[in-house]
Every structure is written in structure tokens, then in C-alpha cells.
């Protein structure tokens, strides 16, 4: 009998059921997970939380309005009915969704987090993961499209509308899957010892995977744009020896350089700190990552606000369409190219092609 009684405590270990399966905590409160991870769960609004929430809501509104303007501009102006602009519109849609996700977060954070259930907390985080993954995937798709276009010496790719739709569907499918993975099982609800400090219901392994996935995507984008720039610079220098307009070539090269620096700089500034913070949360237990979490979250949010400016507002034709929409004006010539856009080669793809075809001043 003594031998039998000593085996009973082994069967009733707190983390395992009688069937030797891990114990799950689906019915626990959010406070339970936050207390275990050591993350402070506010009971009332302090000054910093109010400032962060106010700034976050303001940025969310700007994100939604700016990206809605981009989508409407691409829809109403037939000059933008090309694959690159469809991808830009999809990028705007992803960033618009990011604005909605952050807007939902702002009203379910701070003391309001206590009211969430496990399911609603995972939904809140899943919306953010989905929107941010879609934005990054769209940036990568645009980089690949520009790379193909430049090296084939085309103004626009010959990709059919059907293929563009397939690319967009793949982007959103991947984004939804990435956002849903924690909700369908890759979390720490049944592995309570491996919960993240920053995201108390997320598994450390998932956050490492998600951070590395985005950092690898960033590296691929850097390589693609560096390859584009190197190719255009080489072509420009070669043609300047046989062209009567070397000054134009230098200006085109500098314009491309500025655009690439803005694109890559915005991505680095907005994304890298938060992704590194996720890795530090897992790999550096002594690091106080929670002290910087809210600020880096806002920084990542700013990327969705910058994308319309970087990819669209530098285009003079896009700017003119913005003014027409905001002033409720009708386009005088919705089907043909404008003289201004012909002269300036204002969009990013016009700029790239101008460097390749330095002797051809007609880009349409």
C-alpha cells in the first residue's frame, strides 16, 4: 500500500492531466497570463498610457484616410491601371487594414485588457499580425515586380490581371495564415512555461519565427533594391559616355538613390527595433523589453502611414489625382498620359526606366 500511495502525487502533477497530456488554461483570465509573465496589467489610465493611446488613435485615422485616398486615386485614374499600381493599391489596402487593427487595439489596451477573454485577446493580436504581414509581403511583391521590370527593360510588366489577382490572393492568404497560427494552436495556453513576456499568451517559439521571417524578408528587399540600383548606375555610367545628356543621367541616378534610401530607411526605422525587441524578449531574460514595447509598437504603426507617402505621393500624377479627389474635381483626360507626367517621369518606375533608356524621353 505504501508503494501505491507514493505514486499518486506523480499522477497529479499540476501541468499534466491523468492521460499524461499537457494542462491547458483556456478558461483562465487574461490577468492570470500577465501575472505569470511578469507583465504589468494596468488597472487605471496613467498619463503615459493616455498619451500613447491619443497618438495611436490619431495615427490610425491618418493611416485609414491616407490609404483610402490612394486606393480611390488608383481606381479613378486609368493611367494607374497597371500591375505595379494594382500592387500599390493592395499595399494601401493592407495598410488600411492595419489602421483598423490598431484602432481596435487602442480601445482594447491598458486597463481595458482585463475585460478580454483568451479568444478576444488572440483576435486582437491576430489582426495586427495579419495586417503587418500583408504590408511586408506587399512591399516584397513590389520590389520583385520592379526588379523584373527593370532587368527586362520595360516600363510595365506584361503580367496579366489574372496573375496580379493570384499574387494578391497569395499575399492575403499568407497574411491570414500567419495571423491565425497562434489562435489555432501555436500559443502557450497549453505550454505555460514558455509564454512570452511581451505577448503573454504567445509562445516564445512563434515570436522568434515571426521576427526572423520578417527580418529575412527585409534582407531580401535590401538585396533586390541594391541589385536594381547597381544595375541602373552601371547602365547610366555606360550610356553617359555616349550620350549628350550626362547631367540628366546623374540626376536620374540620384533620384533613384533618394527613393531607395527613403524606402529602406523607413522600413529599417519602423520595423527593426520591434523585431529585435521580440528576439531580445526570448534570448535576453535580463533585458527590460517591456519598458520600450509601446513606443516600438507605435513606431511599427508609423510604417503603414509612411507607405502611401513613399510609394505614391512622390508621383506627380498621383499628387494631381489626390488634389482632384479632395477638391471634388473631374479629370479632364482620364485615359491618356499627361504632358507633365511625360516630362517629369515622376513615378518610381518612370525614374528607373529613364536611367535605363536615357536617350528616350518618351516614357509612355
UniProtKB/Swiss-Prot annotation:
Segments on the Cytoplasmic side according to the record's topology features: 76-83, 145-163, 226-255, 316-364
GO cellular component: cell surface; cytoplasm; dendritic shaft; dendritic spine; endosome; GABA-ergic synapse; glutamatergic synapse; neuronal cell body
PTM characteristics: N-glycosylated.
Predominant localisation class: other
Tissues expressed in: Expressed in many adult organs, including brain, heart, colon, small intestine, placenta, prostate, ovary, pancreas, testes, spleen, skeletal muscle, and kidney. Little or no expression in liver, lung, thymus, or peripheral blood leukocytes. Detected in lung fibroblasts from bronchoalveolar fluid from patients with idiopathic pulmonary fibrosis. Detected in bone marrow-derived mesenchymal stem cells.
A Pfam family annotated for this UniProt entry: 7tm_1
Gene3D superfamilies, A to Z: Rhodopsin 7-helix transmembrane proteins (1.20.1070.10)
Domain of life (superkingdom): Eukaryota
UniProt modified residues of type Phosphoserine: 341
Keywords per UniProt: Cell membrane, Disulfide bond, Endosome, G-protein coupled receptor, Glycoprotein, Lipid-binding, Membrane, Phosphoprotein, Receptor, Transducer, Transmembrane, Transmembrane helix
Membrane topology: Multi-pass membrane protein
Subunit structure of this chain's protein: Interacts with RALA and GRK2. Interacts with GNAQ and GNA13. Interacts with CD14; the interaction is enhanced by exposure to bacterial lipopolysaccharide (LPS).
Name by which UniProt lists this protein: Lysophosphatidic acid receptor 1
Gene source species: Homo sapiens
Gene name linked to the record: LPAR1
Amino acid at each position: 500500500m505504501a508503494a501505491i500511495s507514493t505514486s499518486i502525487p506523480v499522477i497529479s502533477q499540476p501541468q499534466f492531466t491523468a492521460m499524461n497530456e499537457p494542462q491547458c488554461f483556456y478558461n483562465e483570465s487574461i490577468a492570470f497570463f500577465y501575472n505569470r509573465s511578469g507583465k504589468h496589467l494596468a488597472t487605471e489610465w496613467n498619463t503615459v498610457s493616455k498619451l500613447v493611446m491619443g497618438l495611436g488613435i490619431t495615427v490610425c485615422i491618418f493611416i485609414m484616410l491616407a490609404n483610402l485616398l490612394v486606393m480611390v486615386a488608383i481606381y479613378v485614374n486609368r493611367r494607374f491601371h497597371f500591375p505595379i499600381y494594382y500592387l500599390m493599391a493592395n499595399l494601401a489596402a493592407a495598410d488600411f487594414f492595419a489602421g483598423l487593427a490598431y484602432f481596435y487595439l487602442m480601445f482594447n489596451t491598458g486597463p481595458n485588457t482585463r475585460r478580454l477573454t483568451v479568444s478576444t485577446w488572440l483576435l486582437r493580436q491576430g489582426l495586427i499580425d495579419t495586417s503587418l504581414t500583408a504590408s511586408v509581403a506587399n512591399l516584397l511583391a513590389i520590389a520583385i515586380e520592379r526588379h523584373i521590370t527593370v532587368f527586362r527593360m520595360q516600363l510595365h510588366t506584361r503580367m496579366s490581371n489574372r496573375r496580379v489577382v493570384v499574387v494578391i490572393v497569395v499575399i492575403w492568404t499568407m497574411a491570414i495564415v500567419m495571423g491565425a497560427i497562434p489562435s489555432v494552436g501555436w500559443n502557450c495556453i497549453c505550454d505555460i512555461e514558455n509564454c512570452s513576456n511581451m505577448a503573454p499568451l504567445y509562445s516564445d517559439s512563434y515570436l522568434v519565427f515571426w521576427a526572423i521571417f520578417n527580418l529575412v524578408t527585409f534582407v531580401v528587399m535590401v538585396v533586390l533594391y541594391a541589385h536594381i540600383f547597381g544595375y541602373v548606375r552601371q547602365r547610366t555610367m555606360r550610356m553617359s559616355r555616349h550620350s549628350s545628356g550626362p547631367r540628366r543621367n546623374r540626376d536620374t541616378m540620384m533620384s533613384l538613390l533618394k527613393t531607395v534610401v527613403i524606402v529602406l530607411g523607413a522600413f529599417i526605422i519602423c520595423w527593426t527595433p520591434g523585431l529585435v525587441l521580440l528576439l531580445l524578449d526570448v534570448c535576453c531574460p535580463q533585458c527590460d523589453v517591456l519598458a520600450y514595447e509601446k513606443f516600438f509598437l507605435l513606431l511599427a504603426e508609423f510604417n503603414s502611414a509612411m507607405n502611401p507617402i513613399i510609394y505614391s505621393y512622390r508621383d506627380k500624377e498621383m499628387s494631381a489625382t489626390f488634389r482632384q479627389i479632395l477638391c471634388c474635381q473631374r479629370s479632364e483626360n482620364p485615359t491618356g498620359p499627361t504632358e507633365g507626367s511625360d516630362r517629369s517621369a515622376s513615378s518610381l518606375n518612370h525614374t528607373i526606366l529613364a536611367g535605363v533608356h536615357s536617350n528616350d524621353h518618351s516614357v509612355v
